[in-house]
Amino acid sequence: KDSAVFVNVARGSVVDEAAMYKALKEKWIARAATDVFEEEPTPKDNPLFELDNIVMMPHMCGDTWETFEAVGLFSAQVIIDVMNGKDPKNWINK
């Protein structure tokens, strides 16, 4: 649909970048936005950079002050738990 806007913030591997480039270049879709790519970091010669109907951003999904604080507090609690002989929360490979 030529008015469609495609957004990918999942994984770069779920999109065929060559097909997305063609769809954008030939106006099969109106616009796209992504923060993930087939190859990361994205090479400077990626043809998507030539297009003006795509917004590309670096993949920074959790880079907020709140996230940094939560990760720091969680990590500190895990260390405290282990030092006190307790199993850490969310231990996935026990």
Where are these regions (language model features)?
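Rossmann-like dinucleotide-binding domain for NAD(H)/NADP(H)
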Residues: 3-94
